[in-house]
Amino acid sequence: MSEYAIVAPEDFDQSVFRLIGKEWMLVTAKNQEGKVNTMTASWGGMGVMWGKNVAVTVIRPQRYTKEFIDQSESFTLSFYDDTFKKDLSYLGSVSGRDEDKIAKTRLTPTDANGIPFFEEAKIVLICK
């Protein structure tokens, strides 16, 4: 996808239950050295806490992607159509610590103001 429309969080009208629970998402971040890593997640949520819009996902401390998120001020949650299900499955089963797993998928890394995501995403949420 080469064109994106910016949507205010309060205007986001997609089913979070479907997106996260059924279609899955990629959690993607860049570390201080500029390397990008991603992981697949099928858990999380979106809502409002104390007047702030939030997106929530839980990442185990031993996950390689958590190191990237901890080093970054921003990360993305991105969603894909079903044709990328095998890619998301692969990205969720292999560690970027052991190999360049992104290179073994059909996904094309890109960024918005230095915040990484993939061109093929149908929805990208930039989180801070």
What are the roles of these predicted feature ranges?
Residues 1-128:
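Active-site-proximal mixed secondary-structure blocks
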